């Protein structure tokens, strides 16, 4: 099973990129994790934010792997504990499909993206910088994989 994290936004600051790369490396023997960065749509004074979100959505959909199980990160999505995420990951593995996790832009996901998602996941009600969400998702995927492999990383 391969995993693709498709994130809309600017290039991450070096400390986020380094942290992501660390978890990407740790995950590599359990589940290869690829980051695909989607350039954000044009926003600003006099620009239509919905148009920008729809443009991002088209590019996100184009970046989806064929037949992947798609999980959109979305505030109203289903909250999961680390243990529940590990259970979901075990279920996804059993399906034999690749995974795609989607992080939206400033206004979230386009409607078409949410419709294409197999499920949505909320990492909580906090408002977080989207760059930081990349790192949180990578860490939680590593934690879930470690739990499934009986690795001592998770000590809750």
Swiss-Prot record:
One Pfam family of this chain: SPOUT_MTase
Keywords from the named record: Cytoplasm, Methyltransferase, rRNA processing, S-adenosyl-L-methionine, Transferase
Gene transcribed to yield this protein: rlmH
Top-rank lineage group of the source organism: Bacteria
Free-text function comment from the UniProt entry: Specifically methylates the pseudouridine at position 1915 (m3Psi1915) in 23S rRNA.
Complex and partners: Homodimer.
UniProt protein name: Ribosomal RNA large subunit methyltransferase H
Chief place where the protein resides: cytoplasm
SUPFAM superfamilies: alpha/beta knot (SSF75217)
Keyword Zinc included in the entry's annotation: no
């Amino acid at each position: 099973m391969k995993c693709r994290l498709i994130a809309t936004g600017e290039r991450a600051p070096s400390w986020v990129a380094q942290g992501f790369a660390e978890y990407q490396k740790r995950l590599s023997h359990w589940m290869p994790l690829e980051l695909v960065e989607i350039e954000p749509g044009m926003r600003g004074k006099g620009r239509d934010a919905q148009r920008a979100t729809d443009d991002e959505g088209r590019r996100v959909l184009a970046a989806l792997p064929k037949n992947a199980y798609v999980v959109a990160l979305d505030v109203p999505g289903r909250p999961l504990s680390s243990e529940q995420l590990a259970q979901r990951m075990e279920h996804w593995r059993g399906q034999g499909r690749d995974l795609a996790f989607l992080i939206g832009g400033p206004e979230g996901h386009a409607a078409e993206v949410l419709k294409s998602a197999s499920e949505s996941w909320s990492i909580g009600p906090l408002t977080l910088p989207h760059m930081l969400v990349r790192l949180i998702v990578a860490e939680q995927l590593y934690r879930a994989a470690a739990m499934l492999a009986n690795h001592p990383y998770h000590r809750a």
